[in-house]
Amino acid sequence: MEEERRLRGRLSRRRPPAGGGPPNCRPWFLSEESKSEPWAALLRSTVGGNTDWTPNSQPLPPLPAFPSQESLPDPESTVPPEVFTVGSKTFSWTPFPPALRGSGSSCRLLRCPEGSPGSPAPSLKGCPALDSRQTPSTQECVQSQLVLLNCPLCQKAFDPKLTQLDVDSHLAQCLAESTEDVVW
């Protein structure tokens, strides 16, 4: 048993420094041998002249709020969930936030049937205008009858005479054959 202890070695506590005062706890990046290391130089520049690392130092002030958190209200608290019933079950659904103005990525893919299909910027006079603070209900979306101009996966142009079932069938087939992740 003693032989095992001798082979393992002994662990001992560090002795306090002579003089009885608190130990000199200088951070590693303030030591003389770390002057040339880039991380030490970066840390030294952030510390500046304040090298007081004792726990008795005053606490730091809280960080300021992020600018976008102050100006925007919480979207989840402003939009009430929609409730719908299918058969005997009732479901609640929280609608997506309204699209940001200036994000015209979906404008190129959708058009109203009244718009001219050959124009580069389709006319939306038959579609209801969306208020940026209001999400359209499901009934409004069905009544607006937006039509997909082309497939977002293969970019095939859809004939205006195609039914919604034909478009959905093509999208399902294209999505099934796709190996890429698509964000809708």
Swiss-Prot record:
Pfam families on file: FANCA_interact, UBZ_FAAP20
* GO terms of biological process kind: DNA damage response; interstrand cross-link repair; translesion synthesis
Q: Where in the cell is it found?
A: Nucleus; Chromosome
Q: What is the predominant subcellular site recorded for this chain?
A: nucleus
Name listed for the protein in its UniProt record: Fanconi anemia core complex-associated protein 20
Q: What does this protein do?
A: Component of the Fanconi anemia (FA) complex required to recruit the FA complex to DNA interstrand cross-links (ICLs) and promote ICLs repair. Following DNA damage recognizes and binds 'Lys-63'-linked ubiquitin generated by RNF8 at ICLs and recruits other components of the FA complex. Promotes translesion synthesis via interaction with REV1.
Q: Which gene encodes it?
A: Faap20
What are the entry keywords? Chromosome, DNA damage, DNA repair, Metal-binding, Nucleus, Phosphoprotein, Zinc, Zinc-finger
Per the record, where are the segments of Polar residues compositional bias? 47-57
How does this chain assemble?
Component of the Fanconi anemia (FA) complex. Interacts with FANCA; interaction is direct. Interacts with REV1.
One GO cellular component assignment for this chain's record is: Fanconi anaemia nuclear complex
Locate the region Disordered.
1-30, 46-81
